[in-house]
Amino acid sequence: MPNIILFDNDVREKLLPLTFTRPNCELRVGILRIREKWEKHLNATASFITHDYLAGKYGIDYDDDNFFINGSVLPSPELVTLVKQMDYNEAFLQNDELIVARLDARQLERLMKDDAFEALKGIELEGTPFLKINQLTDLYRLNGEAIRQDIELLQKERNFVELPGSNFAKAKDQIFVEEGAEISGAYLNATEGPIYIGAQAKVMEGAMLRGPVAIGDHATVRMGAKIYGGTTIGRWCKAGGEIVESVLLEYANKRSEERRVG
């Protein structure tokens, strides 16, 4: 399988301040980061083309065969199928914006040096569904659908454990619990979308979750919290009170029960 390189473009400016410290593809939408989604779909490790001051941490690694992918694009099964069928020097476009290109090392080196390189065969993506982050509001607006897509992807590789019997659950077959999660005396309603509970996460007594919802590894949902659909609680977060259609990135806390987020 070709190497993966995820690149930033002008969309980065619309995702500030979050992209001051990371490439676009390191944003979490749904359960996984955009980079992680591509790595799982293409079974390869990704590297980055981003701003110079981030390159020390997020460097580039290229090979003789590379998928050059827009870092704000979320892979869908339909898009991934087309990507796997690409030939060298083909490029998929949407409204003249580059989505994916397949480049050899020589072409990629010329691109990075801003040298002239061989023309690519541009193919407009018409009727191919996929999600794309164009502005900050897309992170939560598209989050519910991204959770659904990630669950379909993770089901292929994970063995989830059964929800403990002390909880009240609706649509239990749409509740996905990683090993090591602690859930006791909670209310989980997955009739409108899946609920994902990550490894070592803790959902305390009286918490209410209405899917689609994702609780990241090591996160804590406090007693009596109300987590509504379209919400991701990131790794190591602590969440309390009422949270609606929101994305809490790693190590963010919302403990107050008096104020609503979302």
Name every feature range the model reports, one short phrase each.
Residues 162-262:
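Structural signal for interior beta-strand "rungs" in well-ordered beta-sheet cores
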Residues 1-173, 180, 259:
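Terminal amphipathic alpha-helical/low-complexity segments used for targeting or macromolecular assembly
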